[in-house]
Amino acid sequence: MMEEYQEINKILHEIDDGNTKRKVQLVKNKKDGKLYVCKTIDFNNNNETKDSKVKREREYLFLKQYSSPSFSHLNIAKYIKHFETRDNHGYLQKLTIIIEYYEGGDLTNLKNLNEVLPKDIIYLFFTMLVILKEFKNSIIHRDIKPENIFFVKNGPDLEFYLGDMGSSSMVITDQKNTLIGTNQYMAPEIDLGGYTCKVDIYSLGKTMLSLITLVHSPMNSIFESLFQLCTLENFKIRPSIDQLIEFVCRQYDQSRYTISLSSYTHPNTRSIIKYFKDKKFNILKEGEKINFKIDIQSKFYNCISVYRGFAYNEYIVEEEEKEKEEYQKEENQQSIPNVLSIVELIQPPLQDLSKDFENVLINHINYIRDGGINGSIRSLLHPDIIIKTKCDRVKGFEIKAHSNITNTEGLFIENAHLIYKPVNLSWKKIFLEREDEITPDVQLKAVFLSLLVAFKISNDENDFLTGTLFDKLMEHIYFVKSPSLPPPSQISPIKEPLSSYELKISFPFNHRAHIYGVKVPLNPNYLNLFFGGEIKDTLISNLIQTLNILAPNNLQYKSILIKLISIILKEEKRILKSYSNLGLEIYFKEFNEIIKNEIALEGIVSDKLLVSKIDTTKKIEKIRGFRNGHSNSDADIYISEFKGKYYAIDKFEHIPGLFEILEPFSNKAIDDFNQHFKFISTFVDVNESFGLVYTIFELPSSLINSYQTTRKSCENKNILDKDKTFRNLLNQHLSYYQNIQNNRYKLNGTDLTSKKLSFTEYQYNIIISNDCDIHYYFSFVGKNGSGLVQSFFDIGAWVYGDENVKKIKVLSFFYLLQCLFDYQTKNTHNSVDIDFPNILYYLKKFYYSSLVDYGLNGMDSSSKIFNYDLNNSYSFIKIGFLIYNILDLYKPNIIPDQTLYYDSDLIVMLLENSSNKFLCFRKQYYSDLDKTKLKLTPENIVPQNNDNDNSIILLPLLIIKDDITSFHFFDYNLKDSIKTIEDFNNEKECLLYYLQNIQKNPSNANSLVLINLNLFEENESTDNESFLFFDIFYLIKQLHGLSTIIDSWDNFISSLSKPISLVSNYIQTNLKKILDDPLSIDILYNDESMSHFKPFIYDKIKEIKKNVWLIRDKNNNNYIRKLSGYIKSKFKEVEKYGFEFIDDVSISNPYLKIAVENGWPISFLSSHFKRDNSNLFDYLFNKELIILELLKEKGVDGISQLESYFVENNIIYILTKYHGDYSNLEEINELNQEDLFEILVQMSDKLKILESLQIYHRDIKPENILFKREIVNGNIQSKVCLIDFSISDFGFILKTNESGSKMYQAPEIYQEEYRSKENDITNQHYKLDIYSLGFTLSHLMKKFNCNPPSLVQIVKKMIKHKAFLLKQPTL
């Protein structure tokens, strides 16, 4: 009984179709603790026929039958047991079935897996074929879809099971014309009446096509073509289960020695093939077989496989029977090599690296994913050429092969280059079939040839192609009679000894979607070509063993190949003696030449050689911060050793064109700046991920053993020792800088002393040795004005740690000064000038504060560096033509903005101009700054007037601004009184006061203000003044999730008072806090200017359905509150609500077009569409709000009435009238003939009005029609009200929209043959709402056993399946 199972609070599925209630949920067996699926079916319709009651038992009978041991080969959800309750007549009332639980879930969960492989998709298809073959003469499933197929992970593989037999039908006993199934996967003939087991073929094809999008690895496109055939609408030409089985068996046989074999690598796929063959399911007459034809160079082949690679298409084909017969007749042959691999190169070969194979160089091809199974390759050398990587969809049984290359001029290239590879002569096939004839010399030739080819590619500096060779396991070796491959029809089967044949290599095209530049992992089994066979020479065993040792070390491929060739040459004498005159001499000649060239090259220290000798375990940390604008992912320099010399190698990611712009360092070397690191060269390697640039220096001897950095030792020092270390490093740094400034150096004839701060104009790096000595080197020449300023902060961060350094005010000063001084900003809206005395002025603060803190008497000996008069030496900032000394810099306590390149969106500056001092807030709105200097105009300089009656709001004294940056000046004496929202928790009052100020002074809306906190009640007793820094943009960022600037401030201000705005959202969301605060209530209810901000106060009464509530306002009025949209910027936060039916609303929205064309009043649209594109408050609505406003404007009666709408917690809600005295038609217990006619008449009137407005309700059903009877003037009258427009839409955009309740939907909504017509739906003659109304009336007539003939005739016309072909009844 069910007592042995414990329910788990996880309902998987629940549905009530009026006759039955189905609930599927997880349960746990109390004894073994295992999870199972419990399917409970309640049969609650007492009016159903005897036959329908008998059919109730079919599901568990089917499950029970196919769960028996005799059907163990079928992957069907396993029946465990069932429980039943029967009525007095013995019919089922309640059925509970316990089924095996599959932890992966259904196929819709496959998208959560990291990768779905082609072998999984093919195995799933084979598994379903086994089941459908078993069902063929007895059962039709009728509801195959992803939701009814379940999977579990079995190690790296997937296992699949077909479930939900509830829709299944017996072939013999049932007339198969019932509308059972799922819209998207339902075969068209089901709706037309009369169908066969081919409906399951259709559903399976649809399911497989939906799953292909999850496969990111290249897949044999023939299978997609096969799945397309399964979904042909004409079931007469749709393939049968027997045809499909014969095709896949033949496909497997023809693909055994090709790249297509990877499709069949699931461990159970081959057992299914064997099962089909043992049962002789794979035998069909020739005329019944499925064949895909392909035309290549005017010759037709039967196509077996189609793959798209990076720069090629590969087809596995078989010659047609006619061709085979003619050839056999001419050549008098018994068997012929009729299976070919034809490789079509998209681009002609750029270079032949060997006469034995042809190579396509792809160094400059960058792989780009377009999404789904579509992909493309864009050539960086020729960006106008795009190579498509997805096979064209087939039409019928024919494939047209072409190269799919087009450029912007529309040129088309076909058959750029073809390579014919005879599959029957491949190394793998010959070895497996004639292993006894594979002599030792043949084995050695194969190994030697593969190594030579790999070396030639590697020597051409293409590790990617070498890795491809290593990865393909010799699938590219073929036996041929002559150096060139003859045409396929001339290739004869091998009869002579294999040693008399030549081995040739074609390029090993790799079908896995490697992103360009990613190094293919070395396959340690690369040389093990013998597929478990005997290795017939010890040299090969030695090579394989060596390769297995070297593979895990991540060495460069060329180094591995040199090692292997050296081993081969040690046995040259033995090999040539043992296998004389067998053609091995040519290989040893090549090997000796390779080693000779490598020895000659060792005398020259090449850049590539030094890079190859990098020891990744030996690296030195560099002080960060001097390479802004480039990747800082590698914060170390690496050490390379060669012949006793040590080299420092720095690297960064190569950006195409960057190295050409930055001239090689050797052209601009500054010897004196480079005195610690002697520059060698710069080397670009594009074979690694996106390419790397290596800068090579000679490593100073004092750094050779500095693998352990002082950073680690600093972490254990106390603060006093850290201060000493920092002062020592600063002394070295400043002394070095001073020496450069005091001497004359020339760079390419240019006098550096004529340049101010020349040292800071070049990007350099700092290295600190174990002895705390500073060393410098330049990675490349580039301008960076902030280098020197930033260096003080970075050295401090290195000593104190990233967190503690921010506590040292003087160092934070340099960080913020660097933000102002950065090359991106210094020449734009403001500029900062700084010189040597200015730097020392701020550093002196650190020296003196340290000495005072630790009781030290006087400066140490190194203080002689301060040889300048430091009195009143400041850095200064130019704002337009006004100059201010920078007395101090700091950041307020606000949440950092991580979206900016620098965290420089807000800096507080203490400035001095003559005798006047100011507190200045510098606000930067965008990280990308305008390159035009600020021109001061009357509009730029805005003096402010603080003589207003609002003593709470303190406005700036002066504002200087452009479109990107603004400077707000306040009284200097307020500098110690500033707080932020993070410091103080009175946001609600501050916001409301600020809004109050905006309403009275709109021109001040976009300025930064200070709010006097002492005037709030709880702060009146505070002795010291406190002012809250208030920035409306910062508030928008925190409350609304956006950081932007408003192009039209006036529009923004006017939007604040609209029903849907930042303000109304904030107030409604924080309603409880605001209503608990007397001060907030006073602002909202006693100030007339704030009256439109009053919140909507209501209580929830009950939830009617998801996102729909009955609510009551403070005046006891009842409403229906429905979710209708959301604030667009908060999309990620409200995804959980499910907004499939909500569309973007913009100025180009088609609703405006409808309004204009029909002459409607569009006042109700203005609040939705008259918005600037840059406005923060862009919304997403469903159509319900717009449609209800239109119907309200038109005064349409008997339809759900819109009362109002509001926004809360970023969600837009609409309020409609609550019809408490009505009942929906599904709830009503009694209707008579007059009632049904009244419903028809009133609903027809409403639909006619909706049609005139081009509105389609789309969900007419009993639950959405309200009905009541009332007495008027002594007479009983019936009233009907149509509600729930949540999925309603305008006519001309209805195509392919399948929303709605299936039972009441017109067939054209979900049947493919009626979808996607060329003409708009408005030009077609069907009436989908009429169909739904007809089906509703049909349901009510059956429910209440009321069938007046006239009404029956009308309803029959309303629900004709092909209603669009017939003349509709007049409404």
UniProtKB/Swiss-Prot annotation:
EC number(s) reported in the record: 2.7.11.1
Positions bound to ATP: I15, D16, D17, G18, N19, T20, K21, R22, K23, K39
MF (Gene Ontology): ATP binding; protein serine kinase activity; protein serine/threonine kinase activity
Transmembrane helix in keyword set: no
Domain of life: Eukaryota
Gene3D superfamilies: Phosphorylase Kinase, domain 1, Transferase(Phosphotransferase) domain 1
Top-level class of the enzyme under EC nomenclature: transferase
Signal peptide from the UniProt entry: none
Protein name: Probable serine/threonine-protein kinase DDB_G0293292
Protein's organism: Dictyostelium discoideum (Social amoeba)
Taxonomic classification: Eukaryota, Amoebozoa, Evosea, Eumycetozoa, Dictyostelia
